[in-house]
UniProtKB/Swiss-Prot annotation:
Similarity-based family: Belongs to the universal ribosomal protein uL18 family.
Gene of this entry: rplR
Gene Ontology BP terms: translation
Annotated source species: Prochlorococcus marinus subsp. pastoris (strain CCMP1986 / NIES-2087 / MED4)
Protein name: Large ribosomal subunit protein uL18
Superkingdom assignment: Bacteria
Amino acid sequence: MAKISRKLQTQKRHKRLRRYLIGSTARPRLAVFRSNNHIYAQVIDDDAQQTICSASTVDKELKEDKEKLSSNCSSSSIVGKLLAKRAMKKGVKEVIFDRGGNLYHGRVKALADAARDAGLNF
């Protein structure tokens, strides 16, 4: 029997999780996408099907820190702080965390912890 690839496992896990993780206007969804080189996070209102705010390691605001930003935990925590700051500015205090099928470990955990420390509740 062939071994299931890691990417396919992540996709299956994400499909399972999305049945239960539905963001609303009162409590939007914080969705995380992790690639090999970058990490992306969005605060999404699923009722209105609209992205409230987003942040990533390729963000224009973080362009001066481009040399420091890569696919590591410290970059993820910088993105988490930036996302929380933008969400608070838009009036979002509570979110539902959608890890995107990734394990809650490493870069995903660093982003979540930084967003929590910056004031988001989940």
